[in-house]
């Protein structure tokens, strides 16, 4: 079934003319309204934008589009032009896109979705296109902006108006390409409606966000929407993933070109693969020929992400040789298999792995490439107010793959950290785990126990610069704490 989420047939941009004033900017957050804006009062997941119409008008909104539902009526004291729009939340991105001149139409937009790998692939593609002379920006978990000049963000995929504003800003600043992480929440909540995607990339589907979606089936259906997007030219899909194979088989090749990739199968696959602490060496078969790729990126699962990038570059007109050459220059995204130490001290690896699949892949990778005789430590926890079903699963994975499992807090949010730890311990032999709820102390303990040749994986938070405890985000960086722990390690008698 073709999802026509970018150009709803019953939305007519000419309707905005009924407001009787020039429209240069729209805003869906009353706190960000500027004088002269048109305020989009949408019903949201946790709040109703119609409740903030008075606040938007006080800030100078010139007109209001409001969600026509639930018997809501415009109040006479709100003396401003207004227009009732059914399902405004679904149309907000489309309205913003038309007001801003359809910015994605002038860009090559690559959307990346899947449980794991979105951030790495989006960053690597932005780097690669930029190094190839095509100015590239990105929108995602670690930040928004041009590579090397990112601003922090609170959501993987921003709200629909912000998405369009960012695309318009990047177009104005000369971008040719935008790589965008597209979360299941973003698709389910219509945040990318109005975006014209050239290429969609699917990484994998493993357990995550079941607290929101309720089932893996619903989670998969959300991801699937991106690959039946109106006007999509290319779909790059992981054929090692069962859902990916099903997805690829359901796409009409007359509408969208499908290129699969994978470590075991796919149109783009390795004929040879060597993984070490120094990086990856691959000989890759592709529809465009065979090529050797050398990179400093670490880990077999990163080899799969690299193949996704190689395929995406090639379907967008980059020659195979140029694509392979530029991948050799790629640097890892912050908090994604990011290492510190090594050589004459333990190696500490910071990674965002916060799902069972991601944790298992990170541990398996490091177990494979660690020095002979070296031990593998795993410092990890599970987030509060999120799917509790994955907690014992992650405990079992840490016990299976790590020589020393160090159980600590992640972002407990409103939950009791000790209760989360008990949930994790239910999946493992508690006697084999070192428990330290204080994350900083846990990292210091693991590094202090480690020797030269040992590897310490600090998993779960990656790039994050905070820890959310009891609803308060306190400054915290796994990377900074790891550096401090290594400094202390070096000062030992």
Curated annotation (Swiss-Prot):
Family matches, as Pfam families: Mur_ligase (PF01225), Mur_ligase_C (PF02875), Mur_ligase_M (PF08245)
Binding sites annotated in the UniProt record for meso-2,6-diaminopimelate: 386, 410-413, 460, 464
Residue positions binding UDP-N-acetyl-alpha-D-muramoyl-L-alanyl-D-glutamate: 30, 156-157, 183, 189, 191
Cofactor: Mg(2+)
Modified-residue entries (N6-carboxylysine), positions: 223
Keywords: ATP-binding, Cell cycle, Cell division, Cell shape, Cell wall biogenesis/degradation, Cytoplasm, Ligase, Magnesium, Nucleotide-binding, Peptidoglycan synthesis
Broad EC category: ligase
A GO term, aspect molecular function: UDP-N-acetylmuramoylalanyl-D-glutamate-2,6-diaminopimelate ligase activity
Sequence positions that bind ATP: 114-120
InterPro entries: Mur-like_cat_sf (IPR036565), Mur_ligase_C (IPR004101), Mur_ligase_C_dom_sf (IPR036615), Mur_ligase_cen (IPR013221), Mur_ligase_N (IPR000713), MurE/MurF_N (IPR035911), UDP-N-AcMur-Glu-dNH2Pim_ligase (IPR005761)
Localization: Cytoplasm
Reactions catalysed, as given in the entry: UDP-N-acetyl-alpha-D-muramoyl-L-alanyl-D-glutamate + meso-2,6-diaminopimelate + ATP = UDP-N-acetyl-alpha-D-muramoyl-L-alanyl-gamma-D-glutamyl-meso-2,6-diaminopimelate + ADP + phosphate + H(+)
One GO cellular component, as annotated: cytoplasm
Family, similarity comment: Belongs to the MurCDEF family. MurE subfamily.
Descriptive protein name: UDP-N-acetylmuramoyl-L-alanyl-D-glutamate--2,6-diaminopimelate ligase
